[in-house]
């Protein structure tokens, strides 16, 4: 074999996998050796035997021998197959049932299909495209055909017959018996032994011959494939022998070897095979041969599958079953799941974790020993050669060091053993495997990884000692604690992987979780406890401590804030110092009960511009709650700032707490005497009540509640009293604890503990329960031997009246242990259950992704949703918002929204508008306003129709309220001044904005419809918030501000759209599976409550996902029509009409008497009935008298039940008569009789009357009695066993338009019969609901089924108090219903879909699926996730769903000509530097190197701004153009950065570009009052948004800007295409525009300085190529062989001492070079030494380029 030279070229990927069966010819062709001997070694026991099982041609298994086929050694030879020629064909065990089915389809004589196109059904079957389904359809038709027809009736003329070429033979019925098939042939009717059918084993040989005769057409009809799977290949004639590397033997010593199970089994097969051959040659009798044939069959079968039902397992000598090939593949530890889907990996570490509050949120402390073991391969470039050389010198044992050097030819130098490690001269392009160092991104994970937040990217911080350290706040998403948990760390091994980690998985980016659109991290533990203590009223801090604390505020500006209290001594409040950690521009308000703007109780929360105004900061504010501080900061300022906020808060609070102290002791659980008395009283009272109830029960005075038995009602009362007692006791304990109490402090801060904990510690532990009931009686009617029999007292049934503080009595302790044990078992069972549910969900949804056309599809390309989540939004960007058009009365609505310029009541106050007086009576304007108001009224009706209960808080993108608040703050809105807004501006502005909000782009009808649906709700919100009246009267926005608000809404909206490539399926599966893990397994919340029992929690989720046909608790919720719903009596009527009442349920007793005379009776009680009935006899009765039987069936009915069900005797009697017609003679007593009796006699039929019949009459009557009781329905609907009336509140709008609650009666049933109940008069068929979504689907169709399914999934998750965003559950139910039937999330549901075989086999039934795939010759196109994981390829998902291409033509076409230089140039994250400074030398922005090619580039710091600007703190970050986080919130698209003068909002900002559609003379930021804008400035040029001479940052002394720079020109139009405010929805942005180039993410064809022909601008500027940082085709001195060496600069060489970025003597002639310039650092990717020289020289020669 040739030794290929090392190559870095990527390997070809596998595009598709074709399954099939091996034909005998192929097996022989592949084989390199025919195996004939069962021995492995030859006689010497030293070398492998030729022709034996370890034939040397199969591959070497010994270090001493080379492989005879390929000549490689043991490590390089992959092994080669051999083959065994079988003496007789045998069945392949995997296909035996398929072989049987094929035998049933074809004639067993001539091999022809038994049916063909002449049969109508068959014609349909053959049209099925999918081979497996076609085979099943053909088989189900053919299996009934028992003869091979020679001719069939013609279609045109049924009397004529057409020949079809059959042979006319009868077909056997075939049955599988063990490993053989048995055929039974029915004889002809007129044959003499017709009743003795012929029965014999059909041999494999026979079947093989038949299958060989199957024609190609027939084989295709049977779902086979001529090229890859013929039916006869399912039988084995030649057996492939796997090479030894598949079945390696283990050697004990030189002579002894232990063979692998497969080798052992192959030996058995060979022995049996030789045996059969010998018998054949010897001509032994048939039955002897058959015997040994079946042995061969057995060995071949167990070699492949040793778990065959009904077959003995093949065992080794020791009795251990052999591990067959099937066992190697299947199951969790098997090949597929254990070695292909999941492997062990390199570059990972695992150790115990501990907390460290001094680390940043996204850091991880890595032990030095681990940092020295794990490495990262870094390629040597001019920028890092010095650093890497130093690391190589340090060697492998000193921490920042290196372990290996890899040369460009692939050789590894191990620095542990290299003698001359110190003097290795590194060359460009080599790799150094260096230790991991601070700030490397690594992936950190804790199992079980239930959601994506269980694997996040952290920054390394190398630390001493041996545990991983992490910030406390990041433990909640990992669900970690420090009681011994271990975590794993993985080091990425390529730049691309590092980029993905830092840009997609970084902890800050996961703060807001898409699972429930709220943060998944918050302040926890001591910091949370401390933050509450610190922000209480009257917490003051003195000067010395304040000064210390200010040092703990990481970005403190050096200004000591004014103290809150000046005299007698200066004091600062805790709120004040905490505010210093909160970034400015943050607004938050939350009102709790009783909060006003003065907040006397200091509850609620108000933060304005980052200052805490009032409110104690607790879990509600800084916990992981929706709309809390964490959420707002992430949304407003970006993830990075939010991550810093965590650190800031922790540092400040922990320092304060350290000095203030907090501890808890046993004393905190002790209540005072008065409280203890209250507690004792409460418990005594409860016990007294229980005693009373017990007495009542014993005296039989209790009445059962409806739907409950007496005993249930009794238990219910007792449990209620006892729980009341515990709560009351707990409440008094809690109320009487002082606020200083440490337990109470923790509970109220939310850091630990709850009300129940206080109650149990101090007051009373309460009732213990097992399975939701009180402790049950064990032996002899007692719970424990310490109690007397039948003791129902609280003590005996497990009520613990002591508190933990007091201590439990032995009995109490025992009961408490019982309750606790149940909890433990529950948890253990739940873990396994939910783990499996999670796995099924993930496997069912794993391949669902948002595609580039906005649709959500699976790997087959089937559309699951037209728009993800039906609105195309990313769940993380969504917040709950109130749609104000829904609530409130009509009058209030009109007051809030209507403007009528002609009607003084609804006119605008003229003082509000500058144009206030001019607009009065303007009809044209009024029309505009009327249209707006009409639309709002329409919205109101529309929304009220959808949200029938008037709910108006819905999760929507873009928090408009906050944007308006930020605008008012930023632009310092003065609410006393009139605004310069005009009404047209508002109405048209909002209208224009709605048209620009595109989720989907495209003109086709379906896209338009989806687009409309996606934004309908958001537009309603938008119109309700930005209605003209509100904008002018409520918010008082100016024209400038209003435009800023609109632009901001648009930018944030576009940023909220979900990214194509997002794997939303897995996200949904995790979002549902993770809460399920937290759920309680068996919910006993309804312990005895008088209502329907409902399965919930995990068991219910299991039912839903399995689409279980028979649920545990099917139930209907029946809503009634208006007139019935409010009237209890009418509702009762319907209840009795629905509740299924059988005769049995009203019968007390039934008896059979011998009462010979029909007209009198032996039963005294019944004489009255007889007299009444026979006093008036009609002829019919008289006629039947003589035929009546002497046997009498007598039923006694239950009067209570009868009145309850509202039945009369007449109704019951008539019903019986109706059922049995004339066969039964029935009479009954009056309704008011003492006992309600029904008498029935059989009326005999004189024709059939004989002695025998007469003797059996009483038996017959017994049968009649059973039938009667069971099957006679007196009233109600079948299957509805019980109906309970419940009173629910219904929210409906009143006359005034306000929502109010109306109580209504609703029926809850046990049992479901939807179609019947719907048609009961009085039932409201539009609102009826059942939890059996299968019924809903059957009655109302799949769409209704989907809605019901969603509601059920939602209820399960909500029952536990969790919230999961709509889109996740919607995606799951859409997948389950997308095929038009309910597809379960089990192996029978989604795993039977038409996805690739590799993907299906990685779930369950691995081997069976692969067999099936082989027989049907399936083709897997490898588009799913699992397929690519198995093949070890990058799956086409996420960052793998596209390729990045370089446009070679443009590289040549657009040569950079001159250099444009600006005061500030922002180079952003694209790999295209937009022709800014062709050589990228003098860029004024330091781009952080790790973010170079990232679409989410972090802002660079531009020192033109850093040197002053109008910023408060100096320095501002600008985000990249492509960054959706626009500099994490400081761009013009982000509200809340400082004030107008901040560069983020002013024309000095490079982020504003005149070409940007949102920049116009009317644009809010273009205002003559803007402090940094001066039109009088002589060199002011409106085309240069980023140049302003009045800016203090422009000064000749500014190091980064020099007017003498040859490239400087005051009029230079420094157009910067990187403007982040450029918006793709701008009219000029159109993919069809000829000048549009998708490679430049933010370039706009309308740019004045852009012209496709202009050579000076190129979207893919050639001057930058990521692979060669210093490559520029225009540089004459460039030579491809030396990327960084330039002959024009003789003194420059990488090793030259003058090459030192810090050396001031380096290139001092470059006018723009300044040794102090912070950007000039080898870290900066835009720094290139060779260019500096080249450019300088070229400038000197040509003046400019």
Curated annotation (Swiss-Prot):
Family to which this protein belongs: Belongs to the RNA polymerase beta' chain family.
Entry protein name: DNA-directed RNA polymerase II subunit RPB1
One molecular function GO term is:
DNA binding
Concerning CDD domains, the annotation shows:
RNAP_II_Rpb1_C, RNAP_II_RPB1_N
* Assembly and oligomerization: Component of the RNA polymerase II (Pol II) complex consisting of 12 subunits.
Describe where the sequence repeats fall, as residue ranges on this chain. Answer: 1552-1558, 1559-1565, 1566-1572, 1573-1579, 1580-1586, 1587-1593, 1594-1600, 1601-1607, 1608-1614, 1615-1621, 1622-1628, 1629-1635, 1636-1642, 1643-1649, 1650-1656, 1657-1663, 1664-1670, 1671-1677, 1678-1684, 1685-1691, 1692-1698, 1699-1705, 1706-1712, 1713-1719, 1720-1726
- Gene3D superfamilies, sorted: 1.10.132.30, 1.10.150.390, 2.40.40.20, 3.30.1360.140, 6.10.250.2940, 6.20.50.80, RNA polymerase ii (3.30.1490.180), RNA polymerase II, clamp domain (4.10.860.120)
Where exactly is the Glycyl lysine isopeptide (Lys-Gly) (interchain with G-Cter in ubiquitin) cross-link placed along the chain? Answer: 1247
Primary subcellular site in the record, as a coarse category: nucleus
Q: Which InterPro entries match?
A: DNA-dir_RpoC_beta_prime, RNA_pol_asu, RNA_pol_II_repeat_euk, RNA_pol_N, RNA_pol_Rpb1_1, RNA_pol_Rpb1_3, RNA_pol_Rpb1_3_sf, RNA_pol_Rpb1_4
Q: Where in the cell is it found?
A: Nucleus
The segment annotated Disordered runs over 1530-1745
Please list where the region (C-terminal domain (CTD)) is annotated. 1552-1726
| Annotated Zn(2+) 2 binding sites | 107, 110, 148, 167
Q: What does the record give as the reaction this protein catalyses?
A: RNA(n) + a ribonucleoside 5'-triphosphate = RNA(n+1) + diphosphate
**Cellular component per GO, a single term:** RNA polymerase II, core complex
Q: What else is known?
A: The binding of ribonucleoside triphosphate to the RNA polymerase II transcribing complex probably involves a two-step mechanism. The initial binding seems to occur at the entry (E) site and involves a magnesium ion temporarily coordinated by three conserved aspartate residues of the two largest RNA Pol II subunits. The ribonucleoside triphosphate is transferred by a rotation to the nucleotide addition (A) site for pairing with the template DNA. The catalytic A site involves three conserved aspartate residues of the RNA Pol II largest subunit which permanently coordinate a second magnesium ion.
Q: What does this protein do?
A: DNA-dependent RNA polymerase catalyzes the transcription of DNA into RNA using the four ribonucleoside triphosphates as substrates. Largest and catalytic component of RNA polymerase II which synthesizes mRNA precursors and many functional non-coding RNAs. Forms the polymerase active center together with the second largest subunit. Pol II is the central component of the basal RNA polymerase II transcription machinery. It is composed of mobile elements that move relative to each other.
| Gene from which this protein is expressed | RPB1
Residues holding Mg(2+) 2: 481, 483
UniProt PTM comment: The tandem 7 residues repeats in the C-terminal domain (CTD) can be highly phosphorylated. The phosphorylation activates Pol II. Phosphorylation occurs mainly at residues 'Ser-2' and 'Ser-5' of the heptapeptide repeat. The phosphorylation state is believed to result from the balanced action of site-specific CTD kinases and phosphatase, and a 'CTD code' that specifies the position of Pol II within the transcription cycle has been proposed. Following transcription stress, the elongating form of RNA polymerase II (RNA pol IIo) is polyubiquitinated via 'Lys-63'-linkages on Lys-1247 at DNA damage sites without leading to degradation: ubiquitination promotes RNA pol IIo backtracking to allow access by the transcription-coupled nucleotide excision repair (TC-NER) machinery.
Going by the entry's taxonomy, the superkingdom of the source organism is recorded as Eukaryota
* Entries under Pfam families matching the protein: RNA_pol_Rpb1_1, RNA_pol_Rpb1_2, RNA_pol_Rpb1_3, RNA_pol_Rpb1_4, RNA_pol_Rpb1_5, RNA_pol_Rpb1_6, RNA_pol_Rpb1_7, RNA_pol_Rpb1_R
Residue ranges annotated as compositionally biased, kind Basic and acidic residues, are: 1734-1745
| Any one GO BP annotation for this protein | transcription elongation by RNA polymerase II
EC number in record: 2.7.7.6
């Amino acid at each position: 074999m040739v030794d290929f030279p090392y190559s870095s070229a990527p390997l070809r990927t596998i595009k598709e996998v074709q399954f099939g069966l091996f034909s005998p010819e192929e097996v022989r062709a592949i084989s390199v050796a025919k195996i004939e001997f069962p021995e492995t070694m030859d006689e010497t026991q030293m070398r492998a035997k030729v022709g034996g099982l370890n034939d040397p041609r199969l591959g070497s298994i010994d270090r001493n021998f080379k492989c005879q086929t390929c000549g490689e050694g043991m490590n390089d030879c992959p092994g080669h197959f051999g083959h065994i020629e079988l003496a007789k064909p045998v069945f392949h065990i995997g296909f035996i049932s398929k072989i049987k089915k094929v035998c049933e389809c074809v004639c067993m004589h001539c091999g022809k299909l038994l049916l063909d196109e002449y049969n109508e059904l068959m014609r349909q079957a053959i049209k099925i495209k999918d081979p497996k389904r076609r085979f099943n359809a053909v088989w189900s038709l053919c299996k009934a055909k028992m003869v091979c027809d020679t001719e069939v009736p013609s279609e045109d003329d049924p009397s004529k017959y057409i020949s079809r070429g059959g042979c006319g033979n009868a077909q056997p019925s075939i049955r599988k018996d063990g490993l053989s098939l048995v055929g039974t042939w029915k004889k002809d009717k007129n044959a003499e032994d017709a009743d003795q059918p012929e029965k014999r084993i059909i041999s494999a040989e026979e079947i093989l011959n038949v299958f060989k005769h199957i024609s190609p057409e027939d084989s295709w009809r049977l779902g086979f494939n001529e090229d890859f799977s013929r039916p006869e290949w399912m039988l084995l004639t030649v057996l492939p022998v796997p090479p030894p590397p598949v079945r390696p033997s283990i050697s004990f010593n030189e002579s002894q070897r232990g063979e692998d199970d497969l080798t052992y089994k192959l030996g058995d097969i060979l022995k049996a095979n030789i045996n059969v051959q010998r018998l054949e040659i010897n001509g032994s009798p048939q039955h002897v041969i058959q015997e040994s044939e079946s042995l061969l069959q057995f060995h071949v079968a167990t070699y492949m599958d040793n778990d065959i039902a009904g077959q003995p397992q093949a065992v080794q000598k020791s009795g251990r079953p052999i591990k067959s090939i099937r066992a190697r593949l299947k199951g969790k530890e098997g090949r597929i799941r254990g070695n292909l889907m999941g492997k062990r990996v390199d570059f990972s570490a695992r150790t115990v974790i501990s907390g460290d509050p001094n680390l940043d949120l996204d850091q991880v402390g890595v032990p030095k020993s681990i940092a020295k073991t794990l490495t990262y391969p870094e390629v040597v470039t001019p920028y890092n050669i010095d650093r890497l050389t130093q690391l190589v010198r340090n060697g492998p044992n000193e921490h920042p060091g290196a372990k290996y050097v890899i040369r460009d030819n692939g050789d590894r130098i191990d620095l542990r053993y290299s003698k001359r490690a110190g003097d290795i001269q590194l060359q460009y392009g080599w790799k150094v495997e260096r230790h991991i160092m601070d700030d490397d991104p690594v992936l950190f994970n804790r199992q079980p990884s239930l959601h994506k937040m269980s694997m996040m990217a952290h920054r390394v911080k190398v630390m001493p000692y041996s545990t991983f350290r992490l910030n406390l706040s990041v433990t909640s998403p990992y669900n970690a604690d420090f009681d011994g948990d271990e975590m794993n760390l993985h080091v990425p091994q390529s730049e691309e992987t590092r980029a993905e980690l830092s840009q997609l998985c970084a902890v800050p980016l996961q703060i807001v979780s898409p699972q429930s659109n709220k943060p998944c991290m918050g302040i926890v533990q001591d910091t949370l406890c401390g933050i509450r203590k610190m922000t209480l009223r009257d917490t003051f801090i003195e000067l010395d401590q304040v000064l210390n604390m200010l040092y703990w505020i990481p970005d403190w500006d050096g200004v000591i804030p004014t103290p809150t209290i000046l005299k007698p001594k200066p004091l600062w409040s805790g709120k004040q110092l905490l505010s210093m950690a909160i970034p400015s521009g943050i607004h938050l308000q939350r009102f709790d009960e009783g909060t006003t703007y003065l907040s006397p109780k200091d509850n609620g929360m108000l933060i304005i511009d980052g200052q805490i105004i009032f409110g104690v900061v607790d879990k509600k504010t800084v916990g992981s709650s929706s709309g809390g501080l964490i959420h707002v900061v992430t949304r407003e300022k970006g993830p990075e700032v939010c991550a810093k906020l965590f650190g800031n808060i922790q540092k400040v609070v922990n320092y304060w707490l350290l000095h203030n102290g907090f501890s808890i002791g046993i004393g905190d659980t002790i209540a005072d005497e008065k409280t203890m008395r209250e507690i004792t009283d409460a418990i005594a009272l409860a016990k007294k009540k229980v005693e009373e109830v017990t007495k009542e029960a014993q005296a039989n005075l209790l009445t059962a509640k409806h739907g409950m038995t007496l005993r249930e009602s009794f238990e219910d009362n007792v449990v209620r009293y006892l729980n009341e007692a515990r709560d009351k006791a707990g409440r008094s304990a809690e109320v009487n604890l002082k606020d200083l109490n440490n337990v109470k402090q923790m509970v109220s801060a939310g850091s630990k503990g709850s009300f129940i904990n206080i109650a149990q510690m101090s007051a009373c532990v309460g009732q213990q329960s097992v399975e939701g009931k009180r402790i049950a009686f064990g032996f002899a009617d007692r719970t424990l031997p310490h109690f007397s029999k039948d003791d129902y007292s609280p003590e005996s049934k497990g009520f613990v009246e002591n508190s933990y503080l007091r201590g439990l009595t032995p009995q109490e302790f025992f009961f408490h242990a019982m309750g606790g044990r149940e909890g433990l078992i529950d948890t253990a069972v739940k873990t396994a259950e939910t783990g499996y549910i999670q796995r099924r969900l993930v496997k069912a949804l794993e391949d669902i992704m948002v595609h580039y056309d906005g649709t959500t599809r699976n790997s087959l390309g089937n559309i699951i949703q037209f728009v993800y989540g039906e609105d195309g939004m990313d769940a993380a960007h969504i917040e709950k918002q109130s749609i104000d058009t829904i609530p409130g009365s009509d009058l209030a609505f009109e007051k809030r929204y209507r403007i009528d310029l002609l009607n003084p009541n609804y006119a605008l106050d003229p003082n509000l508008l500058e144009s206030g007086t001019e607009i009065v009576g303007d009809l044209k304007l009024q029309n505009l306003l009327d249209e707006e108001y009409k639309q709002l009224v329409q919205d109101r009706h529309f929304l009220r129709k959808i949200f029938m209960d008037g709910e108006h808080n819905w999760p929507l993108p873009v928090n408009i309220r906050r944007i308006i608040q930020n605008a008012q703050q930023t632009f310092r809105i003065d609410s006393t001044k009139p605004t310069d807004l005009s009404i047209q501006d508002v109405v048209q502005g909002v209208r224009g904005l709605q048209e620009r909000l595109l989720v989907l782009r495209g003109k086709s009808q379906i896209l338009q419809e989806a687009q409309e649906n996606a934004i309908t709700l958001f537009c309603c919100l938008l119109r309700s918030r930005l209605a003209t009246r509100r904008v002018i009267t409520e918010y008082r926005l100016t024209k400038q501000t209003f435009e800023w608000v609109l632009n901001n809404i648009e930018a944030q909206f576009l940023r909220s759209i979900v990214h194509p490539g997002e794997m939303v399926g897995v996200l949904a599966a995790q979002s549902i599976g993770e809460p399920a893990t937290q759920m309680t397994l068996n919910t006993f919340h309804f312990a005895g409550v008088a209502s329907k029992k409902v399965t919930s929690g995990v068991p219910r989720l299991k039912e839903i996902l399995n689409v279980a046909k028979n649920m545990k608790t099917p139930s209907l919720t029946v809503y009634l029509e208006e007139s019935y719903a409010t009237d209890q009596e009418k509702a009762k009527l319907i209840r009795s009409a629905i509740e299924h009442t059988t005769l049995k349920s009203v019968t007390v007793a039934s008896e059979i008497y011998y009462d010979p005379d029909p007209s009198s009776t032996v039963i005294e009680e019944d004489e009255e009935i007889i007299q009444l009935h026979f006093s008036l006899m009609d002829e019919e009765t008289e006629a039947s008298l003589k035929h009546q039987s002497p046997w009498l069936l007598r039923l006694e009915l239950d009067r209570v039940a009868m009145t309850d069900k509202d039945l009369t005797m007449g109704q019951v009697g008539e019903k019986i008569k109706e059922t049995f017609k004339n066969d039964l003679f029935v009479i009954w007593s009056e309704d008011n009789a003492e006992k309600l009796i029904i008498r029935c006699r059989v009326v005999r039929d004189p024709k059939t009357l004989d002695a025998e019949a007469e003797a059996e009459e009483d038996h017959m009557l017994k049968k009649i009695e059973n039938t009667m009781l069971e099957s006679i329905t007196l009233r109600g609907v079948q299957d509805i066993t019980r109906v309970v009336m419940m009173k629910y509140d219904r929210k409906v709008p009143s006359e005034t338009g306000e929502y109010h609650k109306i109580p209504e009666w609703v029926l809850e049933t046990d049992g479901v019969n939807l179609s019947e109940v719907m048609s009961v008069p009085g039932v409201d068929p539009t609102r009826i609901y059942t939890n059996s979504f299968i019924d809903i689907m059957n009655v109302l169709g799949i769409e209704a089924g989907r809605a019901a399914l969603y509601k059920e999934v939602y209820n399960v998750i909500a029952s536990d108090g969790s919230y999961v965003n709509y889109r996740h559950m919607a995606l799951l139910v859409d997948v389950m219903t997308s095929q038009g039937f309910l597809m379960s999330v089990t192996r029978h549901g989604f795993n039977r879909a038409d996805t690739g075989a590799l993907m299906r086999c990685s779930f369950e039934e691995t081997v069976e699926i692969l067999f099936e795939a082989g027989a049907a010759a399936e083709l897997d196109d490898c588009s799913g996730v699992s397929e690519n994981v198995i093949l070890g390829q990058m799956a086409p998902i996420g960052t793998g769903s596209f390729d990045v291409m370089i446009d070679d033509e443009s590289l040549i076409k657009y040569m950079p000509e001159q250099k444009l230089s600006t005061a500030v140039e922002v180079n952003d994250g694209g790999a295209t530097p937009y022709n800014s400074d062709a050589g990228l030398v003098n860029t004024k922005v330091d781009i952080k190197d790790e973010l170079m090619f990232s679409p989410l580039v972090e802002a660079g710091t531009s020192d033109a701004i850093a040197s002053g600007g109008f910023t408060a703190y100096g320095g501002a970050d600008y985000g990249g153009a492509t960054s959706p986080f626009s500099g994490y919130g400081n761009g013009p698209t982000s509200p809340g950065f400082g004030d107008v003068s901040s560069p983020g909002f002013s024309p000095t900002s490079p982020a504003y570009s005149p070409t940007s559609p949102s920049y116009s003379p009317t644009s809010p930021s273009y205002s003559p009052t803007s402090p940094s804008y001066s039109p009088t400035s002589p060199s002011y040029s409106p085309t240069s948004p980023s140049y302003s001479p009045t800016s203090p940052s422009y000064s000749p002394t500014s190091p980064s800007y020099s007017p003498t720079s040859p490239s400087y020109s005051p009029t230079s139009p420094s157009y910067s295409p990187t403007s982040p405010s450029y918006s793709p929805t701008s009219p000029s942005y159109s993919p069809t525009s000829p000048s549009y180039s998708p490679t430049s993410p933010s370039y706009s064809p309308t740019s004045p300085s852009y012209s496709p022909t202009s050579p000076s601008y190129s979207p893919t500027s050639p001057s930058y190529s990521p692979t060669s940082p210093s490559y520029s085709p225009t540089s004459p001195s460039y030579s491809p062989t030396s990327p960084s060496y330039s002959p024009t600069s003789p003194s420059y060489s990488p090793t030259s001492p003058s090459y030192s970025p810090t050396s001031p003597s380096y290139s001092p002639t470059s006018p723009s070079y300044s040794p102090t310039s912070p950007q000039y650092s080898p870290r900066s990717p835009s720094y290139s030494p060779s260019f500096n020289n080249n450019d300088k020289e070229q400038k000197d020669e040509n003046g400019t380029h």
